[in-house]
């Protein structure tokens, strides 16, 4: 589960307790700025405490959902975003996570698209180099105006060309991803780089059964992370979500 947004008001203890109680949930992505307060400014002692708490639980701390983005035409802005990303890499290493999620958010109109793609790829490669030294992967979310096009994301990771640079499939319902009711073409395009998966409400027209089948066929053995809007009854929502996920996942 992603703490965005059902779990956003819970601290670490509550997140672990509620996910264990709901059953089926095995991992969590801690989105920055949420109530868990596991951020790059916490102390070494607190990092150790967080790591040990997750290690004692049934819930894996999978990654940190950052808002680092590298599409700005301004090199100084991109440099600062990479530096923020490094801090999250250190946090992920110290707390036992697998990776961090970053994102593109747009193709600025004042520069050619190929320039922005190159900027994002260069920043990804730089951050992946840093992550490799700490065993932390960098996952680019298929996200943002124009940049959520699977073809754009594929080109970014091709140019980044780094073992520690991968993609976070984001289950976007738009026509760039879903073609004639199917995500097969988009999935096959991005398949070599998919390291992390976001799924959303499930109760919509997105081809969930097909996606889960494609993931099984690809031997994807990581997590499909619930990313849903907040609920006034979060515990009830988790139980409902668990049941729907199980049904849609049936072979």
Segment roles from a protein language model:
Residues 26-37:
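A short beta-strand-loop structural module common to alpha/beta enzyme folds
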Residues 43-46, 74-77, 81, 113-116, ...:
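Residue-level preference for long, well-ordered alpha-helices that form the structural scaffold
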Residues 2-4, 29-31, 62-67, 101-103, ...:
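A cross-family glycoside hydrolase active-site/sugar-binding cleft signature
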Residues 11-20, 51-63, 70-169, 176:
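Active-site acidic/histidine proton-transfer and metal-coordination neighborhood
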Residues 39-53:
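Glycine-rich, positively charged N-terminal anion/phosphate-binding segment
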């Amino acid at each position: 589960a992603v703490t965005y947004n059902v779990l956003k008001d819970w601290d670490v203890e509550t997140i672990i307790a509620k996910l264990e109680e709901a059953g089926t949930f095995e991992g969590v992505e801690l989105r920055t700025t949420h109530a868990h307060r596991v951020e790059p400014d916490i102390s070494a002692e607190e990092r150790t405490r967080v790591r040990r708490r997750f290690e004692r639980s049934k819930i894996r701390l999978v990654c940190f959902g950052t808002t680092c983005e590298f599409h700005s035409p301004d090199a100084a802005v991109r440099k600062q975003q990479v530096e923020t990303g490094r801090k999250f890499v250190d946090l992920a290493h110290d707390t036992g996570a697998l990776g961090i999620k970053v994102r593109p958010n747009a193709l600025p109109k004042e520069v050619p698209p190929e320039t922005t793609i190159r900027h994002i790829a260069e920043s990804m490669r730089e951050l992946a180099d840093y992550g490799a030294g700490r065993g932390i992967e960098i996952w680019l979310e298929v996200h943002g105006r124009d940049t959520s096009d699977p073809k754009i994301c594929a080109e970014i990771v091709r140019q980044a060309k780094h073992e520690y640079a991968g993609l976070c499939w984001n289950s976007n319902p738009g026509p760039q991803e879903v073609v004639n009711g199917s995500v097969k073409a988009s999935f096959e395009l991005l398949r070599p780089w998919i390291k992390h998966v976001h799924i959303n409400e499930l109760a919509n027209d997105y081809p969930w059964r097909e996606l889960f089948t494609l993931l099984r066929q690809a031997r994807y053995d990581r997590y499909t992370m619930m990313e849903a809007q907040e609920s006034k009854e979060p515990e009830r929502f988790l139980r409902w979500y668990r049941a729907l996920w199980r049904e849609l996942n049936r072979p």
